[in-house]
Amino acid sequence: MKFGTVWKYYFTESLLKATIRTPSQLNLAPNALRPVLDQLCRLFPQNPTVQIRPIRLAGVRGEEIKAQASATQLIFHIHGGAFFLGSLNTHRALMTDLASRTQMQVIHVDYPLAPEHPYPEAIDAIFDVYQALLVQGIKPKDIIISGDSCGANLALALSLRLKQQPELMPSGLILMSPYLDLTLTSESLRFNQKHDALLSIEALQAGIKHYLTDDIQPGDPRVSPLFDDLDGLPPTLVQVGSKEILLDDSKRFREKAEQADVKVHFKLYTGMWNNFQMFNAWFPEAKQALADIAEFATSLDLD
Protein backbone atom coordinates (compact mmCIF):
# COMPACT_ATOMS: atom_id res chain seq x y z
CA MET A 1 0.00 0.00 0.00
CA LYS A 2 1.42 3.37 -1.04
CA PHE A 3 2.18 6.07 1.53
CA GLY A 4 -0.47 8.37 0.09
CA THR A 5 -3.09 5.66 0.42
CA VAL A 6 -2.09 4.91 4.00
CA TRP A 7 -2.31 8.62 4.82
CA LYS A 8 -5.79 8.83 3.28
CA TYR A 9 -7.07 6.01 5.49
CA TYR A 10 -5.38 7.46 8.58
CA PHE A 11 -6.69 10.97 7.93
CA THR A 12 -10.25 9.78 7.33
CA GLU A 13 -10.33 7.60 10.43
CA SER A 14 -8.89 10.42 12.56
CA LEU A 15 -11.46 12.87 11.19
CA LEU A 16 -14.36 10.50 11.84
CA LYS A 17 -13.20 9.79 15.37
CA ALA A 18 -12.89 13.51 16.11
CA THR A 19 -16.14 14.68 14.51
CA ILE A 20 -18.54 11.77 14.99
CA ARG A 21 -17.36 9.00 17.31
CA THR A 22 -16.00 11.19 20.12
CA PRO A 23 -19.05 13.53 20.24
CA SER A 24 -21.29 10.45 20.31
CA GLN A 25 -19.56 9.39 23.53
CA LEU A 26 -20.49 12.62 25.33
CA ASN A 27 -24.19 11.88 25.89
CA LEU A 28 -25.26 14.94 23.89
CA ALA A 29 -28.94 15.50 23.15
CA PRO A 30 -30.17 14.09 19.82
CA ASN A 31 -31.19 17.57 18.67
CA ALA A 32 -27.59 18.71 19.15
CA LEU A 33 -26.12 15.84 17.13
CA ARG A 34 -28.58 15.70 14.23
CA PRO A 35 -27.72 19.00 12.49
CA VAL A 36 -24.00 18.33 12.88
CA LEU A 37 -24.35 14.94 11.22
CA ASP A 38 -26.47 16.42 8.45
CA GLN A 39 -23.80 19.02 7.70
CA LEU A 40 -20.94 16.52 7.76
CA CYS A 41 -22.74 14.27 5.30
CA ARG A 42 -22.89 17.12 2.80
CA LEU A 43 -19.23 16.27 2.15
CA PHE A 44 -20.34 13.11 0.35
CA PRO A 45 -20.76 13.88 -3.37
CA GLN A 46 -24.11 13.05 -4.93
CA ASN A 47 -24.12 11.10 -8.17
CA PRO A 48 -25.16 13.49 -10.96
CA THR A 49 -26.50 10.77 -13.26
CA VAL A 50 -29.71 10.12 -11.29
CA GLN A 51 -32.96 11.98 -10.71
CA ILE A 52 -34.26 12.72 -7.20
CA ARG A 53 -37.93 13.32 -6.53
CA PRO A 54 -39.52 14.06 -3.12
CA ILE A 55 -42.37 11.71 -2.25
CA ARG A 56 -44.68 10.89 0.63
CA LEU A 57 -45.73 7.32 1.38
CA ALA A 58 -48.15 6.44 4.18
CA GLY A 59 -47.61 9.94 5.54
CA VAL A 60 -43.82 9.52 5.69
CA ARG A 61 -41.49 11.86 3.78
CA GLY A 62 -39.12 10.18 1.40
CA GLU A 63 -37.26 10.38 -1.87
CA GLU A 64 -37.49 8.43 -5.09
CA ILE A 65 -34.13 8.16 -6.85
CA LYS A 66 -34.08 6.90 -10.41
CA ALA A 67 -31.22 5.94 -12.67
CA GLN A 68 -31.32 6.60 -16.39
CA ALA A 69 -32.11 3.02 -17.33
CA SER A 70 -35.54 1.59 -16.69
CA ALA A 71 -35.42 -0.95 -13.86
CA THR A 72 -37.79 -3.75 -12.97
CA GLN A 73 -36.68 -3.86 -9.35
CA LEU A 74 -36.88 -1.35 -6.52
CA ILE A 75 -34.59 -1.04 -3.51
CA PHE A 76 -36.37 0.14 -0.37
CA HIS A 77 -33.58 1.39 1.90
CA ILE A 78 -33.85 2.14 5.63
CA HIS A 79 -31.13 4.44 6.97
CA GLY A 80 -29.06 3.90 10.09
CA GLY A 81 -28.26 6.17 13.02
CA ALA A 82 -28.69 4.19 16.26
CA PHE A 83 -32.48 4.78 16.09
CA PHE A 84 -32.14 8.49 16.97
CA LEU A 85 -29.98 9.92 14.17
CA GLY A 86 -29.95 9.89 10.38
CA SER A 87 -32.19 11.37 7.71
CA LEU A 88 -32.73 11.77 4.00
CA ASN A 89 -29.89 14.29 4.09
CA THR A 90 -27.33 11.97 5.68
CA HIS A 91 -27.92 9.13 3.23
CA ARG A 92 -28.86 10.92 0.00
CA ALA A 93 -25.39 10.65 -1.54
CA LEU A 94 -25.14 6.92 -0.82
CA MET A 95 -28.62 6.38 -2.25
CA THR A 96 -27.72 8.18 -5.48
CA ASP A 97 -24.65 5.97 -5.85
CA LEU A 98 -26.75 2.90 -5.07
CA ALA A 99 -29.27 3.82 -7.76
CA SER A 100 -26.55 4.58 -10.29
CA ARG A 101 -24.57 1.42 -9.59
CA THR A 102 -27.56 -0.95 -9.62
CA GLN A 103 -29.56 0.95 -12.26
CA MET A 104 -32.59 0.36 -10.05
CA GLN A 105 -35.07 2.71 -8.48
CA VAL A 106 -34.25 3.50 -4.84
CA ILE A 107 -36.75 4.66 -2.21
CA HIS A 108 -35.60 5.92 1.19
CA VAL A 109 -37.64 7.60 3.91
CA ASP A 110 -37.44 9.83 6.98
CA TYR A 111 -38.98 7.34 9.41
CA PRO A 112 -39.81 8.60 12.96
CA LEU A 113 -36.77 8.74 15.25
CA ALA A 114 -36.42 8.13 18.98
CA PRO A 115 -36.70 9.51 21.63
CA GLU A 116 -39.60 11.53 20.22
CA HIS A 117 -40.92 8.33 18.64
CA PRO A 118 -39.86 5.21 20.59
CA TYR A 119 -40.49 1.60 19.61
CA PRO A 120 -42.63 0.51 17.77
CA GLU A 121 -43.24 3.75 15.84
CA ALA A 122 -40.28 3.36 13.45
CA ILE A 123 -40.99 -0.24 12.42
CA ASP A 124 -44.74 0.45 12.18
CA ALA A 125 -44.09 3.42 9.87
CA ILE A 126 -41.70 1.38 7.73
CA PHE A 127 -44.24 -1.43 7.47
CA ASP A 128 -46.87 1.09 6.36
CA VAL A 129 -44.48 2.46 3.70
CA TYR A 130 -43.89 -1.05 2.38
CA GLN A 131 -47.63 -1.63 2.21
CA ALA A 132 -48.04 1.68 0.36
CA LEU A 133 -45.54 0.51 -2.26
CA LEU A 134 -47.62 -2.61 -2.80
CA VAL A 135 -50.81 -0.56 -3.09
CA GLN A 136 -49.12 1.37 -5.90
CA GLY A 137 -48.90 -1.88 -7.81
CA ILE A 138 -45.28 -2.79 -7.12
CA LYS A 139 -44.93 -6.54 -6.73
CA PRO A 140 -43.07 -8.00 -3.72
CA LYS A 141 -40.86 -10.00 -6.10
CA ASP A 142 -39.62 -6.68 -7.51
CA ILE A 143 -38.65 -5.22 -4.11
CA ILE A 144 -35.33 -5.58 -2.30
CA ILE A 145 -35.35 -4.40 1.31
CA SER A 146 -32.08 -2.79 2.37
CA GLY A 147 -30.74 -1.13 5.50
CA ASP A 148 -27.53 0.04 7.15
CA SER A 149 -26.63 -0.33 10.83
CA CYS A 150 -29.85 0.12 12.85
CA GLY A 151 -31.62 0.46 9.51
CA ALA A 152 -30.52 -3.11 8.82
CA ASN A 153 -32.15 -4.05 12.14
CA LEU A 154 -35.40 -2.48 10.92
CA ALA A 155 -35.02 -4.06 7.47
CA LEU A 156 -34.66 -7.51 9.02
CA ALA A 157 -37.52 -6.82 11.45
CA LEU A 158 -39.73 -5.80 8.53
CA SER A 159 -38.88 -8.98 6.63
CA LEU A 160 -39.63 -11.08 9.71
CA ARG A 161 -42.99 -9.34 10.13
CA LEU A 162 -43.78 -10.07 6.49
CA LYS A 163 -43.28 -13.80 7.14
CA GLN A 164 -46.82 -13.79 8.52
CA GLN A 165 -47.94 -13.16 4.92
CA PRO A 166 -45.34 -15.01 2.79
CA GLU A 167 -46.83 -13.68 -0.44
CA LEU A 168 -45.63 -10.21 0.63
CA MET A 169 -42.00 -11.26 1.15
CA PRO A 170 -39.48 -9.28 -0.94
CA SER A 171 -37.10 -10.92 -3.38
CA GLY A 172 -34.03 -10.13 -1.31
CA LEU A 173 -32.55 -8.48 1.74
CA ILE A 174 -29.41 -6.33 1.99
CA LEU A 175 -27.86 -5.78 5.43
CA MET A 176 -25.00 -3.26 5.54
CA SER A 177 -23.06 -3.18 8.83
CA PRO A 178 -26.11 -4.65 10.60
CA TYR A 179 -26.90 -3.89 14.24
CA LEU A 180 -29.04 -6.85 15.27
CA ASP A 181 -28.45 -7.48 19.00
CA LEU A 182 -29.49 -4.72 21.41
CA THR A 183 -28.23 -6.73 24.39
CA LEU A 184 -24.74 -5.71 23.22
CA THR A 185 -23.22 -9.14 23.80
CA SER A 186 -21.15 -9.44 20.61
CA GLU A 187 -17.46 -9.81 21.41
CA SER A 188 -16.46 -7.37 18.65
CA LEU A 189 -17.97 -4.56 20.72
CA ARG A 190 -14.95 -4.97 22.99
CA PHE A 191 -12.09 -5.91 20.70
CA ASN A 192 -12.99 -3.38 17.99
CA GLN A 193 -14.05 -0.49 20.21
CA LYS A 194 -10.81 1.41 19.50
CA HIS A 195 -10.73 0.48 15.81
CA ASP A 196 -14.20 1.45 14.55
CA ALA A 197 -13.74 5.04 13.39
CA LEU A 198 -17.45 5.86 13.22
CA LEU A 199 -19.52 4.02 15.80
CA SER A 200 -19.10 3.92 19.58
CA ILE A 201 -20.61 1.66 22.22
CA GLU A 202 -21.87 4.80 23.95
CA ALA A 203 -23.87 5.75 20.85
CA LEU A 204 -25.48 2.31 20.82
CA GLN A 205 -26.29 2.57 24.53
CA ALA A 206 -27.82 6.01 24.01
CA GLY A 207 -29.88 4.67 21.14
CA ILE A 208 -31.22 1.81 23.25
CA LYS A 209 -32.18 4.26 26.00
CA HIS A 210 -33.98 6.49 23.52
CA TYR A 211 -35.61 3.72 21.50
CA LEU A 212 -36.92 1.24 24.04
CA THR A 213 -39.78 1.81 26.45
CA ASP A 214 -39.97 0.21 29.89
CA ASP A 215 -42.21 -2.60 28.69
CA ILE A 216 -39.75 -4.08 26.18
CA GLN A 217 -36.37 -5.62 26.91
CA PRO A 218 -33.27 -5.36 24.67
CA GLY A 219 -33.32 -9.11 24.07
CA ASP A 220 -36.86 -9.12 22.72
CA PRO A 221 -36.73 -10.52 19.14
CA ARG A 222 -38.93 -7.64 17.98
CA VAL A 223 -36.04 -5.22 18.60
CA SER A 224 -33.14 -7.69 18.46
CA PRO A 225 -34.09 -9.69 15.36
CA LEU A 226 -30.96 -11.82 15.67
CA PHE A 227 -32.91 -13.75 18.32
CA ASP A 228 -35.95 -14.35 16.09
CA ASP A 229 -36.70 -17.39 13.94
CA LEU A 230 -34.90 -16.65 10.67
CA ASP A 231 -36.47 -19.46 8.69
CA GLY A 232 -38.17 -18.31 5.50
CA LEU A 233 -36.11 -15.20 4.84
CA PRO A 234 -35.26 -14.36 1.21
CA PRO A 235 -31.68 -14.45 -0.13
CA THR A 236 -29.66 -12.05 2.00
CA LEU A 237 -26.48 -10.07 1.36
CA VAL A 238 -24.50 -9.13 4.48
CA GLN A 239 -21.68 -6.59 4.28
CA VAL A 240 -19.43 -5.77 7.22
CA GLY A 241 -16.00 -4.23 7.83
CA SER A 242 -13.28 -5.97 9.82
CA LYS A 243 -12.91 -2.96 12.16
CA GLU A 244 -16.59 -2.67 13.05
CA ILE A 245 -17.78 -3.01 16.62
CA LEU A 246 -20.81 -4.74 15.07
CA LEU A 247 -18.69 -7.30 13.22
CA ASP A 248 -19.94 -10.22 15.31
CA ASP A 249 -23.59 -9.26 14.82
CA SER A 250 -23.01 -10.05 11.15
CA LYS A 251 -21.12 -13.26 11.83
CA ARG A 252 -23.75 -14.50 14.29
CA PHE A 253 -26.53 -13.68 11.84
CA ARG A 254 -24.75 -15.57 9.07
CA GLU A 255 -24.35 -18.67 11.22
CA LYS A 256 -27.95 -18.67 12.45
CA ALA A 257 -29.46 -17.82 9.06
CA GLU A 258 -27.52 -20.56 7.29
CA GLN A 259 -28.71 -23.03 9.92
CA ALA A 260 -32.24 -21.94 8.96
CA ASP A 261 -31.45 -22.66 5.28
CA VAL A 262 -31.41 -18.99 4.31
CA LYS A 263 -29.20 -18.27 1.31
CA VAL A 264 -26.62 -15.85 2.76
CA HIS A 265 -24.04 -13.93 0.74
CA PHE A 266 -21.48 -12.79 3.33
CA LYS A 267 -18.91 -10.14 2.44
CA LEU A 268 -16.12 -9.02 4.80
CA TYR A 269 -14.13 -5.88 3.89
CA THR A 270 -10.69 -5.61 5.48
CA GLY A 271 -9.89 -2.41 7.35
CA MET A 272 -13.38 -0.93 7.08
CA TRP A 273 -15.49 0.72 9.79
CA ASN A 274 -19.26 1.00 10.34
CA ASN A 275 -21.21 2.30 7.33
CA PHE A 276 -18.07 2.34 5.19
CA GLN A 277 -20.22 2.09 2.04
CA MET A 278 -20.91 5.82 2.38
CA PHE A 279 -17.24 6.47 1.52
CA ASN A 280 -17.33 4.83 -1.91
CA ALA A 281 -16.10 8.01 -3.61
CA TRP A 282 -12.71 7.63 -1.91
CA PHE A 283 -12.04 4.02 -0.87
CA PRO A 284 -11.85 0.96 -3.14
CA GLU A 285 -13.35 -1.33 -0.49
CA ALA A 286 -16.48 0.82 -0.33
CA LYS A 287 -16.64 1.03 -4.11
CA GLN A 288 -16.36 -2.76 -4.27
CA ALA A 289 -19.18 -3.04 -1.73
CA LEU A 290 -21.52 -1.16 -4.09
CA ALA A 291 -20.40 -3.39 -6.95
CA ASP A 292 -21.22 -6.42 -4.80
CA ILE A 293 -24.66 -4.99 -4.03
CA ALA A 294 -25.28 -4.48 -7.75
CA GLU A 295 -24.21 -8.04 -8.52
CA PHE A 296 -26.46 -9.42 -5.78
CA ALA A 297 -29.45 -7.32 -6.83
CA THR A 298 -29.01 -8.25 -10.48
CA SER A 299 -28.83 -11.94 -9.62
CA LEU A 300 -32.23 -11.65 -7.92
CA ASP A 301 -33.66 -10.00 -11.02
CA LEU A 302 -32.48 -12.96 -13.10
CA ASP A 303 -34.00 -15.61 -10.83
UniProtKB/Swiss-Prot annotation:
GO MF annotation, one: carboxylic ester hydrolase activity
Location within or outside the cell: Secreted
Entry EC number(s): 3.1.1.-
Positions of short motif Involved in the stabilization of the negatively charged intermediate by the formation of the oxyanion hole: 79-81
Keyword annotations: Hydrolase, Secreted, Serine esterase
InterPro entries: AB_hydrolase_3 (IPR013094), AB_hydrolase_fold (IPR029058), GDXG_lipolytic_enzyme (IPR050300), Lipase_GDXG_HIS_AS (IPR002168), Lipase_GDXG_put_SER_AS (IPR033140)
Active-site residues per Swiss-Prot or TrEMBL entry: S149, E244
Main localization category: secreted
Keyword Secreted in annotation: yes
Transmembrane segments: none
Cellular component, GO annotation: extracellular region
Short name of any one Pfam family annotated for the protein: Abhydrolase_3
Miscellaneous comment text of the record: Acinetobacter lwoffii RAG-1 has the ability to grow on simple triglycerides such as triacetin; mutants defective in esterase lose this ability, but retain the ability to grow on acetate.
Family that this chain belongs to: Belongs to the 'GDXG' lipolytic enzyme family.
Protein name: Esterase
Species in which this protein is naturally found: Acinetobacter venetianus (strain ATCC 31012 / DSM 23050 / BCRC 14357 / CCUG 45561 / CIP 110063 / KCTC 2702 / LMG 19082 / RAG-1)
Highest classification ranks of the organism: Bacteria, Pseudomonadati, Pseudomonadota, Gammaproteobacteria, Moraxellales
